[in-house]
Amino acid sequence: MVYITRPPDRDPPNPPDGAAGGGPGAPEEVYANSGGTPDEKGEGGVKGGGGDDPQDPLLGDYSNSPEKAPGSTPASGGLGPYVLPPPLPDSDDDESPCPSWYWPLMLSQKTEYDKLDRSNEFEKDQDRRPQRPTTLALPVCLTTEVLVDGRTWHDQNLDGPDSMSTPGGGGASGRSPNGLGARPKDKGPKGKSPPKCGPAGKTPPKDLGARPKEKGPKGKSPPKDGPAAKNPPKDPGARPEKVPLAFPGPGPVDTNPSRHDVIEAAPGDENPYKKMWLPPGTKPPCPTPLWDPCAVLLSSGSTPPWDRRKGIHRNTKVKTIGTPVTPVYLTISDDDLDDRKGAAGGGPKKPPLPSRDPAGSGQRGPTPQSKESTSSGLSGATPRSKAPAGRGRQEPPPLPPRDYDPASPEALRLELRDIVQKVRYIGGAYNELEAIFRDNYERQRERERRMDYALIALIILLIIIVLLLIVL
């Protein structure tokens, strides 16, 4: 079951130390973490921890507040109307529905930062400003497990001597087993309240669930090496300073490790974790991975859930828009590339297209064979012209005849011839530029080599001169 309480209207300020340590004006309903009873109020520092000046410059002056916390007087430095937690819903049992570790962390003691600030005179004047309110925890109370002695597992970990207890009692955060503002816990034997701890932080609370110590003959303790000392059952309730080896889980828990059966929860208390408990002696099932790389290798088209790219299994087929293009394969020969001849096949003579190829006498590489494919014609001939003599006869392209069909094989052949000539011209220009750059690079390397030799000779000469000066 979950209890949700209404949070206060506003976060409360840091309370004075007097209220936290059982000092003047600390009602037990407000601060039950002092370790003192209502009769011990006003005895700040005797049994419930030391109190401080209510008008502390660090914590502000609350004595002139128009509204006081219940049970506080104007002289006691009441904390105002924002201290009491919201009222708890009534329950059938005597135990508070919320454990002690639930309640918001009301800072009952000054932090180390405040103590350092107090030692500084300048900060002492600055600290008269209103204090920043302490942030409250979420007011949601979950039912916790209750041990045999009536204390929760968290209480067992918080109020031991190893829990960094502060001068005000309780744990390091100033809390106590009873909880801040909580109703009194369950009654002890014979209807009496369980005894509380003595001086704060010195003695652990008496554990009612501890089993009685075994007495030897004549009321003495049994010998250490006797039969009674062989692996006695460890009772976590008898040693509150020790943390249990495993989280007991919600509901009442059997503290005897020799018995492995789980005590049933109280009637009417639904345990959401009951279905998760396995019978004794069984191992928990192995977790099933969400993604198995072996399964991915065996299966097709599966990607791990964290792979958002989805690019590995993307459809890589190219989708063409519109009607598919039918490829046309043409072959050209040297006769087609010769401007003085007409088109191949004995057709009518066409006016030659302007040739951008310089004098083709300086071609490098093998001469393309007849009926050469386009790919071999593009890659085989890389001419290099030495004198651009053909630029002078460039003419504007002639107008196509009236019956010119750009999709006819003849027109495509002419266009292919023009493209091949342009490619050869570009290849020749590239070869020229490459030769020029290579020559310049060689000259620069030679110049740098000479400079290196000259520098080395100069250094050697300088060393010789220095040696001669030293000798003379």
Curated annotation (Swiss-Prot):
Coiled coil: none annotated. The chain crosses the membrane at residues 452-472. Residues 1-104, 116-280, 317-407 are annotated as: Disordered. GO terms for cellular component: host cell membrane; membrane. Residues 116-130, 204-217, 232-242 have a biased composition (Basic and acidic residues). Residues 364-379 have a biased composition (Polar residues). The keyword Transmembrane applies. This is Uncharacterized gene A10 protein. The lineage of its organism: Viruses, Duplodnaviria, Heunggongvirae, Peploviricota, Herviviricetes. The gene is A10.
